Amino acid sequence: MLLKLKCTVNNYAWGPKGNSSMAGSLALDGGHIPNLDKDKPYAEFWVGTHANGPAHVIEKDIALKQLLATSPELQGKHEKGNLSFLFKVLSVLGPLSIQIHPTKEQGKLLHATDPKNYPDDNHKPEIAIALTEFELLSGFRQHSQISEYLKLYSEIQELLTEEEKSQIDSLGSYGESSAQVLKKIFSRIWRTPKEKLQIVVDKLARRIQGHENKTALDEIIVYLFTLYPGDVGVFAPIFLNYFKLQPGEATFLEPNMPHAYLKGDCVECMADSDNTIRAGLTPKYIDVESLVEMLNYDETLLPKYIPNELDDGSLLFTPRGIDEFWVQEVKGPAGSIYQLPYSESCSVLTVLYGTATVTLGDASQVLNRGEVVFIGATHDAERPKINISDDFLAFRAFTPSPRALESLSNKRLIID
């Protein structure tokens, strides 16, 4: 079964305004919204069944969640009624919050104790695939490098105790766990009362602003300071890796990995959750205590994710240890035919650019930029075929079957 979907858009303040937003223009071109307001930000385009942004089946005029609940034959035996994933297109003009996402156990606890700010009980591992050059902070730097930066940006030490100052040199060395030392230092800084914090943030940022030859790190700190003066998140680049993804490159964000997107466009896929623990660079609710206790303080090399390359040259993103989602890149030049694999799973296909006709059995749908189609589980020998009219790029998100997950472990990949 092939069914076009009407999906939702979120207007978070960090998104570009009007038609400068890829997420917004996709939503407009795909018929998901009637127009673009030039003065309104368009940050995220959602495809999924999450309660905060559920997709609807256009021709049946019902929520996709409702259709799946009443038509179990559209899914595989391993699927659970709702989509187990949430697919997004993000357009980022200003920085997102310093944040982490919880494990399953932590998600249950957060939701039970604070359902207003943690709207579900799930974890939220996620993969981000760049569509344009994409800048972000993610994962802790090498601890020895953090040690050097705490000396270089010495104003930060005004927030530490004498004991904590004396431990800066031990970051990256043996003895007491380097991660435990980092936790002490990071927690102290992030727990600093706002009034004291503002003084030190301002002092550091204004000194850097006076530099004639600013380093790349100087520039990021000053940039964050101009947007969030006095905010503890201004210090984040001192602790976290800064890097850029080029189009097609990806990063996988495990639970409790600190990160903040800074600029660019990407697609994201994650477990079906909207749980985010924030602590800086945001006017939204922040939860410093949960963040500093749950953070993974291990050092992380640049966390780029290397996908599987398929025989046709397209890419398949299969983060290990995650059974809720895989993402398949679907692309081809005008005049080509792309055949999707047999699948025990339902999937959603979101078109980034181009035009194509998708055929499955007797059903067919013409897809243009921004349109989204739900593809029911095929179960047998049926294979969806995509006849490409114009140069085409889309992403197919689905929940892999147990057989597919096992094939990943055996290094003999099966896509279903």
Curated annotation (Swiss-Prot):
Keywords assigned: Cytoplasm, Isomerase, Metal-binding, Zinc
Enzyme's top EC category: isomerase
Gene3D superfamilies reported in the protein's UniProt record: Jelly Rolls, Phosphomannose Isomerase, domain 2
UniProt catalytic activity: D-mannose 6-phosphate = D-fructose 6-phosphate
Cited Pfam families: PMI_typeI_C, PMI_typeI_cat, PMI_typeI_hel
Binding-site residues for Zn(2+), renumbered to this chain: 99, 101, 126, 259
Gene Ontology MF annotations: mannose-6-phosphate isomerase activity; zinc ion binding
Domain of life according to the entry: Eukaryota
EC code: 5.3.1.8
PROSITE patterns, sorted: PMI_I_1 (PS00965), PMI_I_2 (PS00966)
Any single GO BP term: GDP-mannose biosynthetic process
Active site positions, chain numbering: 278
CDD domains registered for this protein in UniProt: cupin_PMI_type_I_N
Cofactors named for this entry: Zn(2+)
Entry keyword annotation includes Metal-binding: yes
Gene Ontology, cellular component aspect: cytosol
Function noted in UniProt: Involved in the synthesis of the GDP-mannose and dolichol-phosphate-mannose required for a number of critical mannosyl transfer reactions.
Family: Belongs to the mannose-6-phosphate isomerase type 1 family.
Name of the protein in question: Probable mannose-6-phosphate isomerase
Organism: Caenorhabditis elegans
